[in-house]
Each structure stands twice: as structure tokens, then as C-alpha cells.
């Protein structure tokens, strides 16, 4: 096999690969073996006609497509290895010469991983955000706990007041016509929560159970659905029931009921500690991101478009998976966010470019610094993940993870080591 390499443009090369006639003939035999049973030739049992007879009936090129495929599959990887080509995507194959008894010549045009020109990556100067726990944060958490522990009871007498929960049936109309998503039954609406369109909840105040009313509202200009943006709407509402929340008092009895503590002061201290820990994790995460961003800004890379698009594809698939867990699909998401695939892909591009660049930078630093993951470290990582799954048989689960995700775990460990090195060497500035 002979290979000539030509640089077409930055990050794109073309390989001209010449395969010996004997090797191509072997591929022809494989193609014949794969397809022989499909042919029904007069004078022969089906699938028993020899190659030369089949070619006589169907033409010399009858097996070329499969033979070409077999030949490329067996020679293209060797051509890449021989020329130290690291492809990003599948190649564009074009046949130059093909024929039995002749050399098989084809070209493979392929996008390759870009050159990464690292700048300063040790000792980068970065600001570190800090977050304090405020008293209002603790008070808000206590209010949330009160709401969760509140008792909901039917309001036997009286009309709807702010803070009450109205059980309603409603049907919405725009321009006199019903619209999708504008109808509900037995909907629990907390008055004052701001759940519905502006001025909807306020118009229910004073109604009694059994009352009906037409509520007039206007959708916001940027509501997110073209047919409703800025439109006047009328909702026919029937109040079926009114409920009240009985909010518990904030005292030691409340503390005992909602926690493992005996006093309200202990609950407050626990909230403070948990929020401080959460803030610390946030500070560390944001600092890591800032360090990596600084290192990336010092690095020159001309990222191939195909890498950005592939990452966007991954992001779309992740979005689709998350939506499925919520019982939604992409089309529904696009509709209710007033988007389409093109808009979403464009929105994701910036994040995609940053991620691709960050991955390339970390990989290059790992190569320069000779950062590796040992087999023992990979096993420990698999065990750590197995424990997080809460498996009854951690050892068995770790083996399953190791067998299926060894390369991913290896990459994860290397990335963590590189990030630790970058963070440890960085300098915090005011």
C-alpha cells in the first residue's frame, strides 16, 4: 500500500491511497462471498453460479461497491496510522481507479484534530467570587419549610382572599376561539403566587365557591407563543372550592416536627451550615471555570466546524433525554419556547465552542505534562460511582462500569488531575 498526503486547508487533509491489485482481488472475493446467494443465473442453482458468470450477466462492476467498502475498511485505518493522522469525523471517499487485476486507488478527505498552541497555563491570575450566608437566606428557607409543613383545609365560609387556594375550572378564549393549553379542571391556584398571567388572580378575590366569572387579561408581548403574544384573552372561570393554608408557628415545636433538632436555633444553625457548604462548592466550581477560561484565552486553536456541530448534536440529544423524563419531546419544546431546531442550535453554538476548546486544551496539557490514569485509579473511580448508585453489590456494579466505561473513566481522571494542577498553580487576585 502506498499513501500520499496533501494538506487541503487548515485541519483538512487528503490521503491518496493506492492498494495492490492482489489485495483488491481479495476484497472482490469477499464481496462475491457476501452476495453470491442473491443471484439466480440460468443453468445454476440459486447462489451456486461462479463469479465470472455473474459478472458476465451483471457487468464487471457488480461487486465493486462491496469490494471497495471491504478494501477501504482494511486499508484506511493503516493509512491514518502510517501518516499520524488523527481524524475528527468520517472521511469523504472518492474512487480514482477501480478494476479487477488493477491497483485500487482512492482518496480520503478528512477533517483532523487542530493544532493546539498553548500559552501560559500555570500561574494564571483569576478573581475568586465569595458568597456569604445572609439572614434573609435563612429566613426564606424557614418560610419554605413552613409552606411545606402547612395544613390545607377547606374554607367553609367566606370568599377568596389573598393567600387562599382556589380550586377552579377554566377555559380561555382569544379572538373568541379556544386555544391550546387554555383549559384546566380542578386546578389549584394559590392567589398571590403570580402563577397565572398578570391580573388573573386578583380578579378572583371576593368570589365564593360555586361562583363563575369572565376574567379579562392580556398576554405579555413576549409570552413565548406566537398566537398568544400580546393578545387580549377572556377566561371563563368557575370556583369549585376554596382552601386555606394553616402556616405553623416558627418555634421549638416546629423544629422538632420538621427536623431532628429540638430547638429552632439549632435548625437555623443547620441551615446556615448547609448554605455555607453549598456556597463553598459554588465558589470552587466558579473558580475552576474561571481558571480554565483564562487558560483557554491564552491558547490559540482554529476549531474545525465539524467539531462544534458534533458537540451541538450531543447537546440536542441531552436536551431530548431531559425532556423525555418530563413527558415532553423536542417539537413540543420548540413550540412552547417559540423556537425551532435552527434557533436552538445557534443558541447552543457559543457553549459548544467553549466546551470543545476546553476539552482540546485539557487534552493537550495532559499530553505535555504526561498526566495519566493508572489502572488502580480507574478501578477506584468505578467503585466510587458504583457506591453512588447505591448498589447492593458494589464490586459487581464497579466491574460492569469498568467493563463498559474504562476509557471514559480514564479521561475523567486525567481531566480532574489537569484541573487540579491548573487550580493549584493559579493566583487569586482582588
UniProtKB/Swiss-Prot annotation:
Residues 163-248 form the PPIase FKBP-type domain. It is an enzyme of class 5 (isomerase). PROSITE patterns: FKBP_PPIASE (PS50059). One of its GO terms (molecular function) is ribosome binding. It is found in: Cytoplasm. Signal peptide: none annotated. Its main location: cytoplasm. The keyword Cell cycle applies. Pfam families: FKBP_C, Trigger_C, Trigger_N. GO terms for biological process: 'de novo' cotranslational protein folding; cell division; chaperone-mediated protein folding; protein transport; protein unfolding. It catalyses: [protein]-peptidylproline (omega=180) = [protein]-peptidylproline (omega=0). Keywords: Cell cycle, Cell division, Chaperone, Cytoplasm, Isomerase, Rotamase. GO terms for cellular component: cytoplasm. The keyword Repeat does not apply. Its EC number is 5.2.1.8. Involved in protein export. Acts as a chaperone by maintaining the newly synthesized protein in an open conformation. Functions as a peptidyl-prolyl cis-trans isomerase. Consists of 3 domains; the N-terminus binds the ribosome, the middle domain has PPIase activity, while the C-terminus has intrinsic chaperone activity on its own. NCBIfam families: tig. PANTHER family: TRIGGER FACTOR CHAPERONE AND PEPTIDYL-PROLYL CIS/TRANS ISOMERASE, TRIGGER FACTOR-LIKE PROTEIN TIG, CHLOROPLASTIC. Belongs to the FKBP-type PPIase family. Tig subfamily. This is Trigger factor. It comes from Clostridium kluyveri (strain ATCC 8527 / DSM 555 / NBRC 12016 / NCIMB 10680 / K1). The gene is tig.
Amino acid at each position: 500500500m502506498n499513501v500520499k498526503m496533501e494538506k487541503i486547508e487548515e485541519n483538512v487533509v487528503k490521503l491518496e491511497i493506492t492498494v495492490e491489485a492482489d489485495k483488491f482481488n481479495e476484497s472482490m472475493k469477499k464481496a462475491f462471498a457476501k452476495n453470491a446467494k442473491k443471484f439466480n443465473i440460468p443453468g445454476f442453482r440459486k447462489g451456486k453460479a461462479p463469479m465470472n458468470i455473474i459478472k458476465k450477466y451483471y457487468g464487471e462492476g457488480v461487486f465493486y461497491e462491496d469490494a471497495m467498502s471491504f478494501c477501504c475498511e482494511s486499508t484506511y485505518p493503516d493509512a491514518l496510522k502510517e501518516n499520524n493522522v488523527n481524524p475528527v469525523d468520517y472521511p469523504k471517499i472518492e474512487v480514482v481507479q477501480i478494476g479487477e487485476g488493477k491497483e485500487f486507488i482512492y482518496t480520503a478527505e478528512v477533517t483532523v484534530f487542530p493544532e493546539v498552541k498553548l500559552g501560559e497555563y500555570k500561574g494564571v491570575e483569576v478573581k475568586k467570587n465569595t458568597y456569604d450566608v445572609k439572614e434573609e437566606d435563612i429566613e426564606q428557607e424557614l418560610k419554605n419549610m413552613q409552606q411545606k409543613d402547612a395544613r390545607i383545609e377547606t374554607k367553609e365560609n367566606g370568599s377568596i382572599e389573598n393567600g387562599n387556594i382556589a380550586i377552579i375550572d377554566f377555559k380561555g378564549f382569544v379572538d373568541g376561539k379556544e386555544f391550546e393549553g387554555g383549559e384546566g379542571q380542578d386546578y389549584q391556584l394559590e392567589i398571590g403566587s403570580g402563577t397565572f398571567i398578570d391580573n388573573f388572580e386578583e380578579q378572583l378575590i371576593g368570589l365564593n365557591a360555586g361562583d363563575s366569572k369572565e376574567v379579562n387579561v392580556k398576554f405579555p408581548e413576549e409570552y413565548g407563543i406566537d398566537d398568544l403574544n400580546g393578545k387580549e384573552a377572556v377566561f371563563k372561570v368557575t370556583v369549585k372550592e376554596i382552601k386555606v393554608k394553616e402556616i405553623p408557628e416558627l418555634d421549638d415545636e416546629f423544629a422538632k416536627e420538621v427536623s431532628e433538632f429540638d430547638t429552632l436555633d439549632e435548625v437555623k444553625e443547620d441551615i446556615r451550615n448547609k448554605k455555607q457548604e453549598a456556597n463553598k462548592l459554588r465558589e470552587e466550581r466558579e473558580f475552576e471555570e474561571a481558571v480554565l477560561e483564562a487558560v483557554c484565552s491564552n491558547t490559540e486553536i482554529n476549531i474545525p466546524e465539524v467539531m462544534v456541530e458534533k458537540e451541538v448534536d450531543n447537546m440536542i440529544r441531552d436536551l431530548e433525554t431531559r425532556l423525555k423524563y418530563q413527558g415532553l419531546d423536542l417539537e413540543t419544546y420548540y413550540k412552547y419556547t417559540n423556537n425551532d431546531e435552527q434557533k436552538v442550535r445557534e443558541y447552543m453554538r457559543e457553549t459548544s465552542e467553549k466546551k470543545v476548546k476546553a476539552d482540546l486544551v485539557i487534552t493537550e496539557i495532559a499530553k505535555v505534562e504526561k498526566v495519566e490514569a493508572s489502572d488502580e485509579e480507574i478501578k477506584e473511580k468505578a467503585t466510587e460511582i458504583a457506591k453512588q448508585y447505591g448498589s447492593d453489590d458494589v464490586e459487581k456494579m464497579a466491574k460492569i462500569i469498568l467493563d463498559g466505561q474504562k476509557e471514559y473513566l480514564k479521561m475523567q481522571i486525567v481531566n480532574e488531575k489537569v484541573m487540579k494542577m491548573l487550580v493549584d498553580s493559579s493566583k487569586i487576585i482582588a
